[in-house]
From Swiss-Prot:
It comes from Rattus norvegicus. It is found in: Mitochondrion matrix. This is Malate dehydrogenase, mitochondrial. Disulfide bonds: none annotated. PROSITE patterns: MDH.
Length: 338
């Protein structure tokens, strides 16, 4: 009975994550044994888009890989343990996803993670620059507002920087905005799309409710409350987990969604749009998240901010100083590395 139930669910999951024909994407997850890494690896293993899944961490990866390898989907899974095995994990990869790092605990901001996670991201991206310089790099490790500039500076140091292939995964902000708007309006969240621009921390998270499809209207007080909830949704989860972690399952879902969109676009699917924190000329910040048209070579076209309301304009103006500081902090970290 259970197996009869499980198969349609598995098929539905696969369909929900991709509409493309089968492909042969080689994907690596760095930080695969962690709270985000394990469920993210499960979702990637479940996708017909992925033919090879290589998992890296400093502990437990052989076990995670063995467990996932028993799942009856086509992706071949292999685990790699410790720095000496990292080069083999990365060779030949098309996409590298990096959720590695320490999670937030109650009372911590994403920025409090900087010192630990900056070193981890710099080390891992240096290996990517050496062993898979052409791969798409998707950074989940917080603070994304600083870890993307770190990644870019590391790739520049190695002479292989391509701004169209480095993405800060902010998809969870869009997923949350879609969910919260759908809850308030009684809509199917799968049919709601709210662009979220800016960055990926606190007030730098700017949901453009005015651009939501389908169109929705909220009184100003409700709009302010909704915006605040989207901005602080990560903290909501950290508090609810009471010291036992941060948003891992929803982040894994959002990370998988972004990877599948990217792979679909790399396969030639047209009209694939996702928001992501990338190098940008849309504002005075050198990095900024906006809707992006994805293509075979990564970022095909930045679709920009579009028409916005005075309320949204004000949020952008207030976010820019914080974003600039976070970006500079990341860039300075790499410049000062020994």
């Amino acid at each position: 009975m259970l197996s009869a139930l499980a198969r349609p669910v598995g098929a539905a999951l696969r369909r929900s994550f991709s509409t493309s024909a089968q492909n042969n994407a080689k994907v690596a997850v760095l930080g695969a044994s962690g709270g985000i890494g394990q469920p993210l690896s499960l979702l990637l293993k479940n996708s017909p888009l992925v033919s090879r899944l290589t998992l890296y961490d400093i502990a437990h990866t052989p076990g995670v890989a063995a467990d996932l390898s028993h799942i009856e989907t086509r992706a071949n899974v292999k685990g790699y343990l410790g720095p000496e095995q990292l080069p083999d994990c990365l060779k030949g990869c098309d996409v590298v996803v990096i959720p590695a790092g320490v999670p937030r605990k109650p009372g911590m901001t994403r920025d409090d993670l900087f010192n630990t996670n900056a070193t981890i991201v710099a080390t891992l991206t240096a290996a990517c620059a050496q062993h898979c310089p052409e791969a798409m790099i998707c950074i989940i490790s917080n603070p994304v507002n600083s870890t993307i500039p770190i990644t870019a500076e590391v790739f520049k140091k190695h002479g292989v920087y391509n701004p169209n292939k480095i993405f800060g995964v902010t998809t969870l902000d869009i997923v949350r905005a879609n969910t919260f708007v759908a809850e308030l309006k009684g809509l199917d969240p799968a049919r709601v799309n709210v662009p979220v621009i800016g960055g990926h921390a606190g007030k730098t998270i700017i949901p453009l409710i005015s651009q939501c499809t389908p169109k929705v209207d909220f009184p100003q007080d409700q709009l302010a409350t909704l915006t605040g909830r989207i901005q602080e949704a990560g903290t909501e989860v950290v508090k609810a987990k009471a010291g036992a972690g941060s948003a891992t399952l929803s982040m894994a879902y959002a990370g998988a969604r972004f990877v599948f969109s990217l792979v679909d676009a790399m396969n030639g699917k047209e009209g694939v749009i996702e928001c992501s924190f990338v190098q940008s000329k849309e504002t005075e910040c050198t990095y900024f998240s906006t809707p992006l048209l994805l293509g075979k070579k990564g970022l095909e076209k930045n679709l920009g901010i579009g028409k916005i309301t005075p309320f949204e304009e004000k949020m952008i103006a207030e976010a820019i100083p914080e974003l600039k500081a976070s970006i500079k902090k990341g860039e300075d970290f790499v410049k000062n590395m020994k």
